[in-house]
Amino acid sequence: MTLRLRPVRRADLDMLERWWADPEAQGRHNWFGFAPDGELRRRFEQDGLLGPERGNLVVELEDGNLAGDVSYYAVYHGPNPGSRAFNIGIALLPAHRGHGHGAEAQRQLAAYLFAHTRVERLEASTDVENTAEQRALERAGFTREAVLRHAQYRDGGFHDMVLYSRLRGDRPSQV
């Protein structure tokens, strides 16, 4: 089944709030606790969840059902604007995991960010135990760079993360 990324619509907000507040829907590698009430709607009113420093797009299947969302946020590797990169992420609902949607959605997000921003570098990180996401990133054209020790605090403890990157000039993936 094919998919596309699209901007979040006002009609999606109730569903996104339920997803983001549901530990089961987020999965054990994406659950970081509850967000303040109303935060999603405040961000939507501010910039439609498509800001210059962070944003979200929904993953929509060809039948119109939503499978999850992808996100990006700016990270800086120096004080100047040219040192900005984006870290990307994905959250798929349990029923849509294991079907190749993660690789395709992250490939599309990379293409979108390279087409509409001036960033040279995209990054993604995932738990060292999340081998499904590691495979998805590699299929989406990302290169494994490093293991970041105790880089993420979640579920009462620190977790090692695998860092991936994709540069503007890297050969596109063949998802």
Where are these regions (language model features)?
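Acyl-donor (CoA/ACP) binding surface of acyl/acetyltransferases
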Residues: 1-22, 56, 63-175
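Conserved GNAT-fold acetyl-CoA-binding loop/helix
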Residues: 24-45
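A short helix-loop-beta-strand connector motif used in the catalytic cores of GNAT acetyltransferases and
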Residues: 46-58
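Short, P/G- and charge-enriched loop/turn segments at secondary-structure junctions
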Residues: 43-48, 77
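Amphipathic alpha-helical interaction segments
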Residues: 27-28, 39, 52, 122, ...
